[in-house]
Amino acid sequence: MKIVGAEVFVTCPGRNFVTLKITTDDGLVGLGDATLNGRELSVASYLKDHLCPQLIGRDAHRIEDIWQFFYKGAYWRRGPVTMSAISAVDMALWDIKAKAAGMPLYQLLGGASREGVMVYCHTTGHTIDDVLEDYARHKEMGFKAIRVQCGVPGMKTTYGMSKGKGLAYEPATKGDWPEEQLWSTEKYLDFTPKLFDAVRSKFGYDEHLLHDMHHRLTPIEAARFGKSIEEFRLFWMEDPTPAENQECFRLIRQHTVTPIAVGEVFNSIWDCKQLIEEQLIDYIRTTMTHAGGITGMRRIADFASLYQVRTGSHGPSDLSPICHAAALHFDLWVPNFGVQEYMGYSEQMLEVFPHSWTFDNGYMHPGEKPGLGIEFDEKLAAKYPYDPAYLPVARLEDGTLWNW
C-alpha cells in the first residue's frame, strides 16, 4: 500500500491547527495533528519542505521504519518542531493501518484495557466563589476529576484564568506580540491553599482534585507548597518547577507525598528517562502531538509502567481534535493509564473535525469507526485562514522575566 499524497493544512476555526493528510494508492486517508501553539508555521514548513516529499512512494504499513527514518535520518534529532512533524506522520499512518484492518485504532493496539477513559476538566474563576460555581457546574456534568485554578488577590493576571465568566481558558492572544503578565510567587503560595480548602469544604473528596503550577516555582518553593497542601489530597500538582534540571525533583520528592505530574513540554522518551527511572514523578504528561505520535507514546508508556508511573496526557484545545481522538484510542488501550486532559472544543472546531468520540458521566470513548474515528472538512477549513497568536510571557513584579 503506497503513499501517493501528503498535504499540510493550517486552519484557524478559533485556534490555529496544523493538519497532515496522507493518501494511499488504495484510496485510504490518514490524518495527523502537528499543531505547536505559537509556532504552527514552523512545523507546517518542516512537513511541507522536508517530510512530505519523502513520504511519496513509501509503504504506508511500515510505520516504525518511517518513524526511524525521519528521526535518525534528520541528524538534528528531537526538538518540538521535528517531533511535532514526526508525530503527525505517525498518527496519520496508524489511522491508515487501522482503516485497512477495518477496526478502531485501540483494537489494533491490543484492545481495550478499560470501559472508558476518565477525563479531567478545567474549572476557573477570578474569585474563590467563581471557582466554586464553575466546579459545581462540572460536577453536575459528571466529571470525576477536576482541575482548579483561581485568580490570586493582588495580581492582575494569573495562569489559568478565562477572559470572562463561563468562558473557556484561552492563553494565546492574537497579533504579532505576546501579552506580558505579572507574577508573584509569594501571593500565590499564600492564597492557593485557601482555594483547595474552600473546594474540599464545600464539595468533599468525591472528585479527584488537580492543579497546574505551570513551572512557576523554584524547587524549594515547590517542596514547601506540596507539603502545605497534603491534607487536601490532590490527584496531582502539575509542573511545579521547570524540568530542564530534573535532579531538582529529588528535593520536592523528599519533602512531600503530593503526587507530581510533569511532561507536557517533553518531546521524546529521553526527556522523561531520569524522572521516571528515579521515580521522581507519578504521572507522565507527554502528548500524542509532541512526543512522537502513537509510536513515541507507546515507548514512553511502556517504560513508565516499569516504575509504576501512569499516563496523564496533556490535552488542551490548542491541540487539534485529531490529537484528542488519537489520545482516546491510546488511553483506552494503555495498561498504566491515569487520566486524560479534556477542555472541550467549540462547535466551529468540531464542524471542521467531525468525530465519533462520546462523553458520558466523566468518561470518554473514541468510538468504533475504523481508524482514529475523525474526519477533516477541507472546504470548511479553508474558510478559517491562519491567524497569528502567541502564548504570554511572564514577569515578576520587579520586571524580571519569569517562567510562563
From Swiss-Prot:
PROSITE patterns: MR_MLE_1, MR_MLE_2. Binds 1 Mg(2+) ion per subunit. It catalyses: D-mannonate = 2-dehydro-3-deoxy-D-gluconate + H2O. Its cofactor is Mg(2+). Its EC number is 4.2.1.-, 4.2.1.8. GO terms for molecular function: magnesium ion binding; mannonate dehydratase activity. CDD domains: RspA. Substrate binds at N37, H122, E264, R285, H314, D318, E341. Transmembrane segments: none annotated. It is an enzyme of class 4 (lyase). Gene3D superfamilies: Enolase-like C-terminal domain, Enolase-like, N-terminal domain. The active site is at Y159 (proton donor/acceptor), H214 (proton donor/acceptor). Mg(2+) binds at D212, E238, E264. It comes from the Bacteria. Pfam families: MR_MLE_C (PF13378), MR_MLE_N (PF02746). GO terms for biological process: amino acid catabolic process; carbohydrate catabolic process. The record marks P316 as: Important for activity and substrate specificity. InterPro entries: D-mannonate_dehydratase-like (IPR034589), D-mannonate_dehydratase_GalD (IPR053379), DgoD-like (IPR034593), Enolase-like_C_sf (IPR036849), Enolase-like_N (IPR029017), Enolase_C-like (IPR029065), Mandel_Rmase/mucon_lact_enz_CS (IPR018110), Mandelate_racemase_C (IPR013342). Keywords: Lyase, Magnesium, Metal-binding. Has low D-mannonate dehydratase activity (in vitro), suggesting that this is not a physiological substrate and that it has no significant role in D-mannonate degradation in vivo. Has no detectable activity with a panel of 70 other acid sugars (in vitro). Belongs to the mandelate racemase/muconate lactonizing enzyme family. GalD subfamily. This is D-galactonate dehydratase family member Ent638_1932. It comes from Enterobacter sp. (strain 638).
